[in-house]
UniProtKB/Swiss-Prot annotation:
SUPFAM superfamilies named in the record: alpha/beta knot (SSF75217)
GO CC list: cytoplasm
Name of the protein: Ribosomal RNA large subunit methyltransferase H
Keywords (A to Z) from UniProt: Cytoplasm, Methyltransferase, rRNA processing, S-adenosyl-L-methionine, Transferase
Annotated EC: 2.1.1.177
List of residues binding S-adenosyl-L-methionine: L73, G104, L123, S124, S125, L126, T127, L128
Gene designation per UniProt: rlmH
Upper taxonomic lineage: Bacteria, Pseudomonadati, Pseudomonadota, Betaproteobacteria, Burkholderiales
Subunit structure: Homodimer.
Enzyme class: transferase
Highest rank taxon of the organism: Bacteria
Amino acid sequence: MKLIVIAVGNRMPAWVETAWDDYAKRLPPDCALELREIKPEPRTTGKTPAQMMAAEARRIEAAIPGGALRLALDERGRDLTTMALSQRLEQWRAGGRDVVFLVGGPDGLDDALKSACDGQIRLSSLTLPHPMVRVVLAEQLYRAWAILANHPYHRA
């Protein structure tokens, strides 16, 4: 099983790549963490936000592996505690399907794309900058794995 984060945006600061790589390399191969960056639609084209999100959605769809469980990160998504995320991770691993987390661009994710997802979650009630979302998501996925592995990283 892979945990795949498909995120609109590229050219992240070096600290984001460093943090991402650190958490990704900590996870075992049977729970690998992978990032797929999607080129954002240029914001200078005169297109509406809906048109830009639709264009990004087409790129996102092309990056999603067949048969994967799809979860959209959205401000109106379901809150999960760290323990609940670890329980979900356990279920996902038992199911064997890849799990894809979709992170939208500056305008979010296209409504049709969100509707096609198996669920929607949010990382926080606070608004987080996109670079921080990647780091927080990677850390929480690692923490969820650490809980299941009884690793001392998470001390409840």
